[in-house]
Swiss-Prot record:
This is Uncharacterized protein YbhM. The gene is ybhM. Keywords: Cell membrane, Membrane, Transmembrane, Transmembrane helix. It comes from Escherichia coli (strain K12). The keyword Membrane applies. One of its GO terms (cellular component) is plasma membrane. It is found in: Cell membrane. The chain crosses the membrane at residues 19-39, 51-71, 81-101, 106-126, 136-156, 159-179, 209-229.
Amino acid sequence: MESYSQNSNKLDFQHEARILNGIWLITALGLVATAGLAWGAKYIEITATKYDSPPMYVAIGLLLLCMYGLSKDINKINAAIAGVIYLFLLSLVAIVVASLVPVYAIIIVFSTAGAMFLISMLAGLLFNVDPGSHRFIIMMTLTGLALVIIVNAALMSERPIWIISCLMIVLWSGIISHGRNKLLELAGKCHSEELWSPVRCAFTGALTLYYYFIGFFGILAAIAITLVWQRHTRFFH
């Protein structure tokens, strides 16, 4: 009986680890896709080089509506809808950031963050690190910072890109730490509730992380805009 219980716990742990790795993979692909969509938006001229481009305001409005809808109950969404909403959010974020920041900077920052998730996931599988542990989060943060140094040094990036890249890694590490219990809860639903398939758990987890990212990113953007506005008004006074 004890052996059966141990085997059952081991299987549960393996299922949860597989789902968490799925979340890291989808998040990695989402960040790289955001960079690609930003490039595409710029290429087909959906965005503009000035801050008051209409598409940016439309995208921000749609983002706010999506965030409000997801805040009601993100767990009621099935796998297919979660995937569609995830792609929609990626596209909206891509339009907003491409309207504010040079595309090459977006590609560097978002792709580096995506590589952090992918490499950390593979390293966790290789060295048998629990993907839901604090140790894994620390490993991911260090991996991300190492990638920032390697990529930006190789490309001889300007100082603002170095700073934004580092902040992006720290931001995602904070998001994962903040949402860790939520992700573990989602991973546990797979073997405790019939309606929760591994695919649904993984997509809902990735959508939850991106939801947190947009929220934190929006707060930081609001702070930055406030500081710029204060400096602007001081200049004219």
